[in-house]
Regions:
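C-terminal catalytic lobe of FAD-dependent flavoproteins
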Residues: 309, 313-429
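Dinucleotide-binding Rossmann-like beta1-alpha1 core, especially the glycine-rich loop
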Residues: 77-160
């Protein structure tokens, strides 16, 4: 079994690193942003366009984390359903969350159009297949709830009609959300990086932040492996790649659970073959607890599928076999197709499974995008910057106190294998009952 252990999205003719490598760091700057992914660059761009000096510092290569390792599905969705949010947090908050998802998605589209980022963004819609009749019934109620909020276009597809959406007998019908789409994550990141640099953002990469110190005169000193930067304000946008090595990450890592996802991309199947399986070339998912997400690649020549990972540092044959098995469950005719690419990436969750924007000890944070960072990371990075600058734009519904700390936890998600087994059993039991 031969496959490339790297993201398919890296195979582009565009640079994924800054045009200039900094030999020295500025002594003073208005802002330091830690983390050079979608959230960090969006925050820095917002700051720079307000006339402030800003440098982004990243311990690795810019965008090397989730920003160029995701599935490229642009949903602006959150993990809890609208129904669950209304039950647990009240109707007003729940409706505001889903309304902000509409705003964030529209803002992404407008940003790509205004900045002329050719990232193959298409609002194709998404079909989510129901894994049981009870799941389909829940989707029916959720579609009704979603359509109460302006900007949502949800409708149900019965099992006998789903061949028009997806060429499979696995699902019990499903839900289509027309407002969702997808893009090429690598091309979007490359475009965002170029725009940020053009706006005056400096990016220092392969430069680890080791400490954040309070200055007696106000502001912070950012200690890095290349030197120290004095700054007025700090934005932390490290999310699922926060790590446990340095003390300054402790407050955030005790409130975030990083979870690993694994993605495969098939060999070239050809546009006709892909359309045979996915007639409307949408984004796709299912209602399993250990769910899969899948889509055509932007060139419509291959199929991408992602789900949970069994690995730590690099993809293994075990993960490829598991994901290929999931793909074949959906499309049995692909049993003999080859996998050309497989890679890993981290996503992060708060205890509430909601994204968060908050301030603590004069440091601003945007985190917890829960696997939907293609929309939320850029949007909430921008919102964190607006909050730090003091712009009076409409604040995010996610702005508030820091998320809850998890007990007996310091950033190492030791409990995830047990949770995965529990949800895998629930999925197995559900399919056996149906």
């Amino acid at each position: 079994m031969n496959f490339e252990k790297k993201a398919y999205w890296w195979e582009i003719g565009e640079a994924l690193k800054p045009t200039q490598e900094l030999d020295t760091l500025p002594i003073d700057t208005d802002f330091v942003v830690i983390g050079a992914g979608y959230a960090g660059l969006s925050a820095a761009l917002t700051v720079a366009r307000r006339g402030k000096s800003v440098i982004v510092v990243d311990g690795g290569m810019p965008g090397f984390g989730a920003s160029t390792r995701n599935g490229g599905i642009c949903s602006g969705q959150i993990r809890p359903s609208l129904s669950a949010l209304r039950t647990n947090f009240g109707i007003d908050f729940a409706n505001n969350v889903y309304s902000e998802g509409v705003d964030a998605r529209y803002d992404l589209i407008k940003f790509c159009e205004d900045e002329k980022i050719d990232c193959q963004l298409q609002m194709t819609g998404r079909f989510t297949g129901a894994m049981s009749q009870s799941d389909y019934d829940k989707q029916c109620r959720e579609a009704d709830n979603l359509n109460e909020i302006i900007g949502h276009k949800a409708y149900m597809v019965k099992k006998q009609d789903q061949q028009n959406e997806i060429n499979t007998n696995l699902f019990f019908g499903g839900m289509v959300r027309e407002e969702i789409g997808g893009f090429h994550p690598g091309k979007f990141f490359s475009g965002l990086l170029r725009i940020a640099e053009k706006a005056g953002v400096s990016v220092s990469f392969n430069n680890k932040v080791t400490e954040i110190l309070d200055r007696k005169t106000g502001g912070k000193s950012i200690v890095t492996s290349m030197g120290t930067i004095n700054t007025g304000k700090v934005i932390v946008a490290t999310n699922a790649y926060t790590g446990r090595k340095y003390n300054f990450t402790k407050f955030l890592r005790q409130r975030l659970v990083p979870t690993q996802s694994c993605i495969i991309v098939t060999e070239k199947l050809g546009i006709d073959a892909v359309k045979k399986y996915m007639p409307k070339l949408r984004m796709y998912g299912n209602t399993a607890n250990i769910y899969s997400y899948f889509r055509p690649t932007p060139d419509r020549e291959r199929i991408l599928l992602g789900s949970r990972s069994f690995d730590r540092s690099e993809p293994s044959k075990k993960s490829v076999i598991y994901l290929k098995k999931n793909l074949v469950k959906i499309f049995p005719e692909l049993i003999d197709c080859k996998v050309d690419y497989c890679w890993l990436g981290n996503v992060a969750f708060t205890k509430s499974q909601l994204p968060t924007v908050f301030q603590h000890n004069d440091i601003y944070y945007a985190a917890g995008f829960a696997g939907s960072g293609t929309v939320w990371a850029r949007w909430l990075g921008k919102k964190a910057a607006e909050m730090a600058i003091g712009i009076s734009n409409k604040p995010s519904v996610f702005y508030g106190p820091p998320p809850a700390k998890l007990p007996f936890y310091d950033g190492n998600p030791w409990f995830l294998p047990m949770i995965n087994k529990y949800y895998s059993f629930k999925d197995w039991f559900k399919t056996k009952r149906t």
